[in-house]
Amino acid sequence: MTNIITVNNLFFKYDSNQTHYQLENVSFHVKQGEWLSIIGHNGSGKSTTVRLIDGLLEAESGQIIIDGQELTEDNVWELRHKIGMVFQNPDNQFVGATVEDDVAFGLENKGIPLKDMKERVDQALDLVGMSEFKMREPARLSGGQKQRVAIAGAVAMRPQVIILDEATSMLDPEGRLELIRTIRAIRQKYNLTVISITHDLDEVALSDRVIVMKNGKVESTSTPKALFGRGNRLISLGLDVPFTSRLMAELAANGLDIGTEYLTEKELEEQLWELNLKM
């Protein structure tokens, strides 16, 4: 699997007069078609990293390669078309008077012919389940609906990568799961690469890989299963301890020790059934 994004030795600070770097010698890669989660405490450098990838910020030094091209001042607008970004607060992204207008906005700026534009808008709204709201004012939508429209606007541009910058953090648990399912379906349909900045365990669990950032550096890269196996140490990374890990600890405290390796809910259920049959 080829790398769609490669980050080499990034250094960045918001104030050139400061000695402290927000990002210090950050390197990693993102494979084409994978779902990569980036986690860490507030101030760890997660959002700064993806803003550098999207060209919203400029690194002091280092290299960002997107789809085989190094990101520079000359090609930042060209490469930005390969990336769709959805932020925490969708209200900050709305520019159209209606949902349909808002999704079409980026396509108009790109000079997409009217017929193709209407087709893309309809397809994108259908994908996120918002077709019936296309004439609605964005301000009258719920938080989850607004995020769906923001995602539709990104998908309509046909990017290769979608970056979710804590896009589910303001939603209730049900809305969060619905949005994650939507992103998952879109990813499969278009073979999109997803980069997710998140604190949500359900999002992390869907990832192929997880990068942990700490104090502006990459602390570790692992699979979700390996990460969840860190148990109570996850709290220091800004995550909750997974339900299955907490349940296994409770069971062990009551005399039913089934090991310390992290198990998914399905794996734990199967393990408990096996133990039950042996009793």
Curated annotation (Swiss-Prot):
Source domain of life: Bacteria
Record domain ABC transporter: where: 5-240
This enzyme's EC code(s): 7.-.-.-
Location in or out of the cell: Cell membrane
Chain residues that bind ATP: G40, H41, N42, G43, S44, G45, K46, S47
Its membrane topology: Peripheral membrane protein
Keyword terms: ATP-binding, Cell membrane, Membrane, Nucleotide-binding, Translocase, Transport
Annotated InterPro entries: AAA+_ATPase, ABC_transporter-like_ATP-bd, ABC_transporter-like_CS, ABC_transpr_CbiO/EcfA_su, ECF_ABC_transporter_ATP-bd, EcfA_1, P-loop_NTPase
GO cellular component, one term: ATP-binding cassette (ABC) transporter complex
PROSITE patterns: ABC_TRANSPORTER_1, ABC_TRANSPORTER_2, CBIO
Main location: membrane
SMART domains assigned: AAA
Function: ATP-binding (A) component of a common energy-coupling factor (ECF) ABC-transporter complex. Unlike classic ABC transporters this ECF transporter provides the energy necessary to transport a number of different substrates.
Subunit structure and binding partners: Forms a stable energy-coupling factor (ECF) transporter complex composed of 2 membrane-embedded substrate-binding proteins (S component), 2 ATP-binding proteins (A component) and 2 transmembrane proteins (T component).
Family classification: Belongs to the ABC transporter superfamily. Energy-coupling factor EcfA family.
Protein name, per record: Energy-coupling factor transporter ATP-binding protein EcfA1
Gene assigned in the entry: ecfA1
